[in-house]
Amino acid sequence: KISGHFIQGHVDTTAKIRKINLTDKSWILRLELEDKKLKKFLVEKASISINGVSLTISKVTNDYFEIYVIPHTLKLTNLRYLNINNKVNVELDILCKYIYKYSN
């Protein structure tokens, strides 16, 4: 059985943290991709890796995307040290990239 997120460890681009909201101990991170051409690979509910941490995209707009970070993930990863305007490494969902490649 194959399950979970597919993360390879290959950084596709960076993103800048534009906003951090705290809700019930979870964080909502609003990020802006450095390479705008890669926005086509951002899909709500798709996987994304931020600084090597596999997460799920919760919202995508023309200008930014958002992810939720639960307390357990904050406690165990480097994400708890992030601040607004920090740059983070981004690995996009490999399945989104493959589907895009083979459908075009």
What annotation goes with each model-predicted range?
Residues 1-104:
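Conserved loop->alpha-helix
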